[in-house]
Amino acid sequence: MCIRDRSAACRSLANEFGAVLLEEGCGLAPHPLLRELTSEISASKALTLLRLSGDAGVDESGEGSWMEALAAWRIPVLMLAQPRADGRFAGIVPASVAFARALNLSLLGLVQLGGEWDVPKRRTDGLPWCGCLQGPDDDPRGLISCLQHRQEVLARGEASGSV
């Protein structure tokens, strides 16, 4: 069984990390929420995962896009991507990574949702893949380990690599 639902994938990741999961739409103004979250996170030291629904690259609120705000606040971002039926990814995936890099966003990497995880193909993508969430029976330890390593790399100010 594959996780085809981003919300379920985020819940799974939050459970693995022991994190609080918040879900928001991209129509909300990003800066007030990020200001509140960063102060709460600083005070509690608890890991918080924020799942955004909608187009994070579009300024829906009139106060800047979520991508721009996340970059400005230096908040680490993990992108989730579903493969097409043929196993390849739509052009929006590398375009989103390029946009994130142009904004100097703290990109932890990409997680594939569902489909067959093909490491050689993911390496040829040249994208910062961390792993795949295929279903509730999977062992996500490799993905979690990759994400923890990428977080440490970002904390040291180094660039994250690819699979």
Give the predicted meaning of each segment.
Residues 1-5:
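Conserved small/polar residues in nucleotide/adenosyl-binding loops
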Residues 21-23, 131:
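A structural preference for short, hydrophobic beta-strand core positions in alpha/beta folds
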Residues 14-20:
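Post-Walker A helix-loop "phosphate-sensing" segment adjacent to the P-loop in P-loop NTPases
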Residues 35-41, 142-147:
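Short amphipathic alpha-helix with an adjacent loop that forms part of the alpha/beta core around
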Residues 7-14:
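Conserved G1/Walker A P-loop phosphate-binding module
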Residues 23-30, 41-62:
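Switch II (G3) loop of P-loop NTPases
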Residues 152-163:
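C-terminal-of-GTPase-core extension/linker across diverse P-loop GTPases
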Residues 51-153:
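Conserved catalytic-core segment of NTP-binding enzymes
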